[in-house]
Structures are given as C-alpha cells and as structure tokens.
Curated annotation (Swiss-Prot):
Family: Belongs to the serpin family. Poxviruses subfamily.
GO cellular component, as recorded: extracellular space
Organism: Swinepox virus (strain Kasza) (SWPV)
MF term (GO), any: serine-type endopeptidase inhibitor activity
Signal sequence range: none
Gene: SPI-1
Keyword tRNA processing: no
InterPro entries the record matches: Serpin_dom, Serpin_fam, Serpin_sf, Serpin_sf_1, Serpin_sf_2
Protein name from the UniProt record: Probable serine proteinase inhibitor 1
Gene3D superfamilies: Alpha-1-antitrypsin, domain 1, Antithrombin, subunit I, domain 2
UniProt keyword 4Fe-4S present: no
Keyword field: Protease inhibitor, Serine protease inhibitor
Superkingdom, natural source: Viruses
Amino acid sequence: MDVFLKLLQKDGNIVYSPVSISLSIDMIISKKGYIHRPLSPYTNYNEDTISIASRIYGDCNSLNKDPCICMDCIGDMFVLVDFDKNHKDIIDDINKWVSERTNNHIDTIIDNIGDNTKLLIVNAAYFKSSWEDEFIKEYTSIEKFWYNSTEFILVPMMSNKDIYSYGYIKDSDIKIIEIPYKDRRFSMFIPITKVYKTLCNIITIDKLAMWTSTMNLYEVDIKIPRFKVESSYELKDIIGCINMEYYIREGTELNTPSGFRHKSVIEVNEDGTTASASTCCCVADSVSNKEFYAYSPFIFYIKDNTTSDFLFVGKIISPM
C-alpha cells in the first residue's frame, strides 16, 4: 500500500502487482545476510488466471567479486550478464523471457539499459479470470463516465443485478463491493465515493480492513466500466517508500538495485463462466436492495481471499 500511495500521485490510470514486486524483493540479499521469505505461491498457479514473471540480471564483472544475491535460493531466476557489452542482446533476452512467461500478454518490458547498471530486477504480472457471475454483454450500454463534475466521456458500462458482498460507510460516504472470480479464491474489490480525491486522501490498509468489515450480502444493482490497463514503472526511486522491516532479517542491509522495472496488465470485461449463486441467496437481505454505480474515477484491488495477498492494485481515471 505504501507503493500504491506513492503511485496515486501519478496522473492517469495505474495498475501494479504488490505480490510480483514482493517476489522480486525476496530474491535480494545483503552482504551481511540474506532476505528469505517463501517464494510466491502463484509462480506455478493456473496460468489462465495469474501469471507472474520475475528475474534478476546481475553483472558478471561485479557480482563475481562482491556477490549480493543468493543464487542457490533463486535458481534459474538469476542470470549473469555483461552489462558492459551487448545491451541489445540482453534487452531481447529479457523481453523474450517475459513474453513467454506471460503467455505473450506482455511482449516488451524494457527498451534500454542505463549506464553503470550492475543489477537489474525484471518482473511482469498478468491476471485474467472469469467472474463467478457473468456480466451479460447484452446489458452493457454506453453511458457517461465523469472525470470530474464537469467533464465526461462515453464508455461501455457493464451491468448486473445479483447477490454481492457490499458495504456502506456512512461517515465517509463510501461504498465498497466485492466481485468474486469463478473459484472465489480471488475477488476484485472496488471502493467508490462521490469525490474521488477524498478516497485517495484517506485510503490505508487499516481503512480497507475497516471498510470490508462492514460488508454483508445484498442484492446489488451494479454498474462498472469495461477497461484494460497496462502500466510500466521504474521502481528504483519508489522502492524507498516500502516498509523493508517486513522483508529484512534483523542485522541485514538491503543493497538497492541499479534498476527495478515493473509492468502489469489487467483487462476487465463481461466474459466469464456462469456459476451458481444459490449458496449466497439463502443469506441475502432481499428487502434492502443496493446500488453500486462506478460512474466516476475509482480505485480497485484484486485480493487472494485465502492468503490476503494483494495481487493487483490500481486506479481508473479513464476506462477508455
């Protein structure tokens, strides 16, 4: 969330994968010890749902003399290269590897390598899964999506009416909804409010936990825009805002990499398999129907309901 708050300052749409970044950080060690946390449980997960690609490229002239990577811990995720030569070959190898690992959804993550590079962490993440309850394409209509109180664009707005976990925080005038994917292990959460900047100013991990604690099952009339977002970041300057105490053993020091590049893609549309909602209907409050219309900029996050990992976090300023 620290990284997300930093990225919120950027204009336009954003998406990034906290779990992918964490996986890369897990592979870095210091000269006095090594950072060790179990590798991501998603590296071999169903590729139709989530694919994460992470690799470290280390300079052979530097790391052989002064190693800062535990090669035994990461195996083929580490590649020795000569950053003083063959930049094009290294770039081609990186992009080819990422493309293969993400089923060709991400074909280019890097187009140049800076001078004096000694260590380059590359990761890419792609997520696509079917909704548990599909959005019927025939119900999608062109509606207004408001940038602000005076400017709007016309976008395809998906709609559905079904049983969803929904919460309303009265003092902040915030609505939040959970939209589960087909196996219910993963869900997209969307908090919205009338004034988007208000949400940006108050959002924290604790607030998200508090908001989700208010959620109950209701019949909800939901409308969200169809969107596809692709984002790419150089995280070396942002990485300083991460709370490294989560990653680092006592007495170790983190060696800042020369480059830390991250790219994520997420696509949200009507597609999905139809699944039974009968298990929810029996506990739904059918008397109090709710509305959830995302007609203006919003934040979203995809969460693993089993591990509580944040797989993807982002904001939508313009769905088109």
